[in-house]
Structure formats: structure tokens, C-alpha cells
Amino acid sequence: WDNLDGSIERGYAGKSIFKWEEIKLGKNGKGGSISKSLHDRLITYARANASLGINGSVLNNVNASPKMMTAEYINKVKVIANILRPYGIRVYLSINFASPMALGYTKTADPLDKKVQQWWKKKAKEIYATIPDFGGFLVKANSEGQPGPGDYHRTHADGANMLADAVKPYGGIIMWRSFVYGANHKGEDRVKQAVSEFKGMDGKFRDNVILQSKNGPLDFQPREPYAPIFDNIKQTPQIAELQITQEYLGQSKHLTYLAPMWKEFFGFVNPDRLVGISGVANIGDDANWCGHPFSQANWYAFGRLAWNPSLTAEEIAHEWLVQTYENQDEKFTKPVEMMMMTSREACVNYMMPLGLHHIFKFDHHYGPEPDGFIASYPLEWCPIYYHKADAQGVGFDRSSKGTDAVGQYPEPYRSLYDNIATCPEEYLLWFHHVAWDYKMKSGSTLWQELCMKYNMGVAMVEVYRDFWHTSAKQYMKGHEQEWQHTDSLLNVQLENAKEWRNTCLKYFQTFSKMKVYE
């Protein structure tokens, strides 16, 4: 989600690699030269992606600047496209839906306005004349303050189809995001709003429109059930959007390997039903690209799974590890692969176990804030809206007796999730408000289980830290700097895991009135 000023929304590895100021255009605004450092960086970026089978790159943030549609930036995009093309990578752009109005060419951005339609057709012609193999547009519309067709009482289909018609003659596509809440269905359970918004439009989109949806129905949480929009949209092609950058899973400070989470998603949504996979990248201009040395494994795993979703998370972890650290000694690879393979579950446990979700700090999203409430913010941004802790229990009732979010799932999941006795415990507090003394499958009460999960999460990070500090270094000859960096970050991760556990249990104890178990 790279911005034109070099910043990256939810980026944790430095600034953007797309340094627009280092691309100089000729006097006529065309042609262009590029700094050697940027050229070399982009070649390396292209080679890395091509080695994984990644075949496209959206160069800018979904919260897009209208400037992206100016001749200056289109000609700069051409310079990047020329570098990526030999590696089989097409460029795409995120657009601001109100671009023609924001740039002063029209008085409206209404997709049914003839002048607006004409502007986009001319703009598409200009882009494809400059970049003949341009891929198309990614659109975030009527979401979190972004403009869209809803501003003119038009539908998402109206907006997407207008853009689709503009790029259709050149083979372009429109990737329209379904991450929409707080607009037409304000007040409805946020996790239901994508289906409520788009189900009635299924089949009304042009054939070059693809609906792009996040893997879960909320927002890239450490664990969510799969998004039911993948079941409810049957005629419109779909892309799954995964978040490689660890916005909610420790950012670039935690060792959290995401392939197990993505494989979990593919266990519910068959990749064969999708026309593509997109990933919110975790790269920046840091020397190691991804901030945390092990975050590189997530970029690698995304590409490998997009190319071959039948691979196991274990296979990918092993591939990455032996290629990166050039050591196949099982005394090194086995424990480190164990760290990687258990790290996502550990993260869930020390942050938001048993189906808890969205209880992180405001704005930067790093660390816990279960008591979070700001009156001026939308309620669906506030942690207290999601855990609903009270003297009776904790959890969000999405059963048929609550918001009926379970009703958006097909059988057998609808009945499975609806019944507290059969709901998988990893989703329990996602779908149910559960009494503190509710008896879990282990025989413990919910409160005891919650304490145990938080403690397990912290204990796992202690295991990672201790092995890495005492045993890993001897196997990393030539990689001492990466060892030191990871060693330091594991200490940071452990302290943050303890903060999550202590803050959340102390807060929830004010409702449960029960002893905190250690």
C-alpha cells in the first residue's frame, strides 16, 4: 500500500521501493531516466517475484491519490513497467474513483454521467498507448472515506462497469474490492456487510470485473473464519486478498509465519474457485526488504502458494529456510521449522485466542487495547464492540439468536457455528457470547481456558527465544548479522506477548471476577 510520498500504509520495512522522484522525465514529459540504485532495486524485486511465479504488481495504495492518473505519473509508471516486463510482471494501478473531478476535468464522478465515462475512456486510451500491456485498475470505493459510486446513489456494479468498459478494448481488468462497511448497511454487524452489499449485484458486473475479497469477513485478524462472500457470489469471478504485511500479527517485530493461516483458508475456499490471489506486500527499502528476517518467508510463501496451493506450509518453510541460511543440518532446520510452523498459533494465543478479535490499539494496531473506545470514532473501530465482555461472559453473539452472521454460511458450517456445543473452539468467541464458567472440551471453564491460551502463547515465544539464543548461532556461519537481528527481535516479541497476556487478562478479570491462572 505504497503512497506517492514514499510512505507505506501498514508498511514495516522502511519506505517504498518505488521512488518516483528518482524517475526523471524528458522535456516533453515523456521518455525518462531512472537512477541506477532504483533500477537495480527494481530488477532485484522483479527477479524475486518472477522466481515465485508472481505475475503482477499494483504499484500504489488502494487509498489512492488522484495524481496517479496524471500524465506525469503514467509516464513514470511506463519506466517501471519496462523494467518489470522482461520478468513476466504486468503493472496495475489503484485509482481514486473521483479522479476526473479531483483533477478538475468534471464537476462530478457519477459513473452514469457521460462526461465522466468519456474521461475514463480517454484516460484508458492514454494509459494503453503508453503501456500496451497494462493490467488494469484496483478500486477501493465507498469504504473508509474513499469516494465511490454510492456518493451518487449508484451501485458498485455501476461504478465497476463504467471502468470495465473503458479498459475492455485493451484487455484490461477491474479488481473491485468488497471491503465495504459503514455505508449502505451502517449499523449491521460489520462482518455481514460485504455479503449484504454485493450479493444482490452478483451477475450484474461486466465480464472483465473481478471481485476482490479479504480471506476473512473482518480485517486480516490473527484468526477469522473464512469470508462467506466466497460462497454467496456465484457468477462474478473472485480474487482472494491476503495480507503479507503483518498489520495485526506483530508487524515486523514478531516472527509469525503466515502460510499455516493461508492453508487454513484454502481448506474452506478451494483455490480452483478463484481466478487469482492478491497479497498486501510486506516489502520496503530496508536492506533485508521485509524488516524482520523471517518476514521474508511470508513473501516467499505467498508466491509459492499462489503458484501451487497444494504445497504444504511445512514444505514451503523448509524450502525457504535451507535456501536462505544455506544449512540443511536437521539440528538447525527441524527446530527452526517448528518455530515457524507453530508461530501463527502462538500469536493467536498470546493476542486473541478462542475467537477473540479486533482488540488491538487504535491507529497503529500494535499491542493490546481491550478497553478501547473513542466516542468520535465509528463504533466498529472500537475493541469493546467486538468482545462485548460483561459480568456474564465474553464474545460476540453472531448465532441465529444474535446478528445471524452464521446465516451467511452454507451447511454444514451454518449449523456447526450456530450451536455453541459444536462450534469449533478456535471460533467460539467470534460466534457466541459465552459464560465465564462455561465448560470447555478440556473440562476447564472458559476463564481457565482463556488464561491457559494466553500463557501457552507466551511460553512458545520463550521457547523460540531460548533456542535461537543458545543454539541457532552455531549453524549460521556467514549469517551472524541475521542471527543477531532475529535474536534481538525475539526479545521484543516476548515482551509484547507478555504485554498482550497481562493487559487482556487483567482487563477481562474485571468482568469475570476470577483468579488469573499462571
Residue spans for each PLM region:
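Feature activates predominantly on carbohydrate-active enzymes
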Residues: 1-121, 125, 129-138, 168
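Catalytic-core regions of glycoside hydrolase
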Residues: 29-32, 105-318, 324-328
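Short amphipathic alpha-helical segments
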Residues: 38-41, 155, 312, 335
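Hydrophobic transmembrane alpha-helix bundles
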Residues: 41, 45, 93-104, 130-137, ...
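Charged/polar interaction segments and conserved charged motifs
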Residues: 62-63, 73-95, 109-127, 157, ...
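Catalytic domains of carbohydrate-active enzymes that cleave complex glycans
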Residues: 273-518
